[in-house]
């Protein structure tokens, strides 16, 4: 398992790949650029051009770990990350009908360089979406979204089957598949609220002193010129 992952990462480095999912699994290797995908597969919504996996991974009904490697492509000195969940198999190719259920709201990743870089991001306890009601045996898809600096997004997915916590079929989380590399920083995304201009302020700028100010401003160059000629 670890050997196959190392081989995948080596190939990734050669072809400037994108986001590699480490835990709980990966829908499949979509690190491909060819005539069919001239810009690369991972830019394609919802799962980077990969069809639904027939070999699903078990994941706890109470939420669990998600880890991935975000820096296998240029332009990710800063990136916006988000994790979503799609329920069921009623959508295209036996997958979810949509990926609109947010598990982790957008946050900023601060990378060490704008060139490709190694390193892992681990979220040890990703919660289920608000209002989620899942049972053991239900099927779903976890979607990791990485928005690059130029605005386009990369998509990677893992197809899961929910299982009760402690189920031996759930892959073990340990320090080799879920850790945060020290060269990464993180930041929250926030909004700035602007105040609507007051009508009183607008009125005060259209009457009274404002016209006189601009009137004097118009005369100032002429006055300055006259003083200079007198000297």
UniProtKB/Swiss-Prot annotation:
Keyword field contains Metal-binding: yes
Protein's cellular compartments: Cell membrane
Domain of life: Eukaryota
Disulfide bonds: 47-157, 122-178
MF terms (GO), sorted A to Z: metal ion binding
GO-annotated cellular components: plasma membrane; side of membrane
Coiled coil: none
Positions of the propeptide removed during maturation: 203-231
Presence of the UniProt keyword Secreted in the record: no
Membrane disposition: Lipid-anchor; GPI-anchor
Glycosylated residues in this chain: 34, 55, 98, 133, 174, 180
UniProt KW keywords: Cell membrane, Copper, Disulfide bond, Glycoprotein, GPI-anchor, Lipoprotein, Membrane, Metal-binding, Signal
Positions bound to Cu(2+): 18
Lipid-anchored residues (GPI-anchor amidated isoleucine): 202
Cofactor(s) this protein cannot do without: Cu(2+)
Co-factor binding details: Binds 1 copper ion per subunit.
Family indicated by similarity: Belongs to the X325 family.
Function: Lytic polysaccharide monooxygenase-like protein that has diverged to biological functions other than polysaccharide degradation since it does not perform oxidative cleavage of polysaccharides. Acts as a cell surface-bound protein that functions in the copper-accumulation pathway. May also act as the major cell wall sensor that regulates MAP kinase-dependent hyphal anastomosis, the fusion of hyphal cells.
Protein name: Lytic polysaccharide monooxygenase-like protein X325
Organism: Hypocrea jecorina (strain QM6a) (Trichoderma reesei)
């Amino acid at each position: 398992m670890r050997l196959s992952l190392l081989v995948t990462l080596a190939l990734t480095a050669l072809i400037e790949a994108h986001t590699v999912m480490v835990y709980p699994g990966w829908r499949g290797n979509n690190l491909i650029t060819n005539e069919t995908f001239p810009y690369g597969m991972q830019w394609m919504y919802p799962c980077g051009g990969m069809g639904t996996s027939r070999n699903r991974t078990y994941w706890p009904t109470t939420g669990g770990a998600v880890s991935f490697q975000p820096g296998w492509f240029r332009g990710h000195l800063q990136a916006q990350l988000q994790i979503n969940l799609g329920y069921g198999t009623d959508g295209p190719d036996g997958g979810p009908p949509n990926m609109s259920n947010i598990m982790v709201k957008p946050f900023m990743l601060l990378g060490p360089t704008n060139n490709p870089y190694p390193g892992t991001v681990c979220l040890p306890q990703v919660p289920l979406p608000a209002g989620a009601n899942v049972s053991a045996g239900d099927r779903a898809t976890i979607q990791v979204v990485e928005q690059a600096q130029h605005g386009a997004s990369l998509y990677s997915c893992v197809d899961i089957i929910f299982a009760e916590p402690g189920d031996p079929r759930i892959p073990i989380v340990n320090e080799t598949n879920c850790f945060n590399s020290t060269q990464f920083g993180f930041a929250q995304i926030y909004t700035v609220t602007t105040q609507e201009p007051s009508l009183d302020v607008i009125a005060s700028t259209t009457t009274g002193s404002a016209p006189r100010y601009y009137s004097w401003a118009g005369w100032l160059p002429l006055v300055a010129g006259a003083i200079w000629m007198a000297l």
